[in-house]
């Protein structure tokens, strides 16, 4: 092909075609014929069956740097809970959302509280299976450096006590009681450090508006841990329970981690002498109601009575909750 022919072909690309009236325009060279018809059209990336995969792909967004993205992602999971409550997606969902208990954003924490409540309404066993990690992050929230995170930690505890309160009391009774006392800025029999007392006085003035919520959570924890659960049984049930007592011992337990108190697979760290004074009762010694009542009487009851009387005199919503705790204490220790 000569040089002149190449130049002519290049010029054709830049020439403007003249349009004539009544004559159609010419089709371009790269046009596609769309005159065919099809009965079905399948697009693999838009199948309805891939809804679960889409939710699984959204899990990394729970760690996004933008708090609005985290909140919107939690809202999507709240709407999808009825569909995914019995799927394998719940395990990674609870394990990743439990970390947001210590999130800096208030909107994210409120949305997370709604998510836990929605999960508990549909299937409380899901929360019971993850109660160990939930207790861990609630305890981290109670000792958080940010006051707003510390104040909201009791809201999560109060919500989860409705669905897995017995498991919480069995596994971390002393930690939860000490955490609520720390949030309320109350001293126990074992906290005699003057620096802690000075810090408690400063935080008590700052957190007065959250005091009513903390006291209601304390009431729920005491009621769940120090009162025997009331179960209505008939005479036929009692006789059948006595006959099948030996069989029940060898059957699958009705609650998760039935032998967790034995700590067969847990690695325990050696505690120093200073830490021993702060925890008079270990978690394995607070598995029944009697030991928890004994723990409250020896460690928390004197301070509780003293502080409650002062709050009742101040009145308000906190005074009402303190009065309820006073009635509960008199009922337990009567």
From Swiss-Prot:
Taxonomic lineage: Eukaryota, Fungi, Dikarya, Ascomycota, Saccharomycotina
Function: Component of the RIX1 complex required for processing of ITS2 sequences from 35S pre-rRNA.
Segments of skewed composition (Basic residues): 1-21
UniProt protein name: Pre-rRNA-processing protein IPI1
Keyword Nucleus tagged: yes
PANTHER family hit by this protein: REGULATOR OF MICROTUBULE DYNAMICS PROTEIN, TESTIS-EXPRESSED PROTEIN 10
Segments of this protein annotated with the region Disordered: 1-35
Subcellular location: Nucleus
InterPro entries, per the entry: ARM-like, ARM-type_fold, Ipi1_N
GO CC annotation terms, alphabetical: cytosol; nucleoplasm; rixosome complex
Subunit composition and interactions: Component of the RIX1 complex, composed of IPI1, RIX1/IPI2 and IPI3 in a 1:2:2 stoichiometry. The complex interacts (via RIX1) with MDN1 (via its hexameric AAA ATPase ring) and the pre-60S ribosome particles.
Pfam family, one: Ipi1_N
């Amino acid at each position: 092909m000569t040089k002149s022919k190449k130049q002519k072909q290049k010029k054709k690309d830049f020439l403007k075609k003249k349009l004539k009236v009544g004559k159609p325009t010419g089709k371009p060279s790269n046009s596609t014929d769309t005159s065919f018809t099809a009965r079905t059209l399948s697009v693999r990336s838009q199948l309805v069956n891939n809804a679960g995969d889409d939710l699984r792909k959204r899990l990394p967004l729970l760690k996004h740097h933008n708090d609005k993205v985290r909140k919107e992602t939690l809202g999507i999971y709240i709407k999808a809970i009825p569909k995914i409550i019995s799927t394998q997606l719940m395990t990674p969902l609870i394990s990743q959302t439990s970390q947001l208990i210590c999130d800096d954003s208030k909107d994210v924490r409120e949305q997370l509280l709604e998510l836990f409540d929605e999960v508990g309404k549909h299937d409380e066993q899901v929360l019971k299976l993850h109660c160990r990690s939930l207790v861990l992050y609630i305890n981290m929230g109670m000792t958080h450096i940010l006051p707003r995170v510390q104040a909201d930690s009791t809201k999560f505890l109060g919500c989860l006590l409705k669905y897995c309160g017995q498991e919480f009391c069995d596994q971390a009774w002393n930690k939860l009681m000490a955490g609520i006392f720390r949030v309320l800025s109350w001293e126990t029999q074992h906290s005699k450090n003057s620096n802690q007392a000075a810090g408690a006085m400063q935080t008590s003035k700052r957190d007065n508006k959250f005091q009513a919520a903390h006291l209601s959570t304390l009431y729920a924890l005491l009621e769940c841990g120090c009162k025997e659960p009331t179960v209505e049984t008939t005479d036929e049930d009692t006789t059948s329970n006595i006959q099948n007592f030996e069989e029940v011992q060898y059957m699958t337990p009705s609650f998760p981690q039935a032998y967790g108190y034995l700590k067969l697979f847990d690695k325990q760290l050696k505690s120093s002498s200073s830490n021993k004074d702060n925890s008079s009762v270990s978690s394995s010694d607070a598995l029944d109601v009697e030991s928890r009542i004994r723990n409250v009487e020896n460690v928390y009851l004197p301070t509780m009575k003293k502080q409650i009387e002062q709050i009742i005199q101040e009145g308000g919503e906190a005074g009402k909750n303190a009065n309820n705790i006073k009635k509960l204490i008199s009922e337990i220790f009567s």
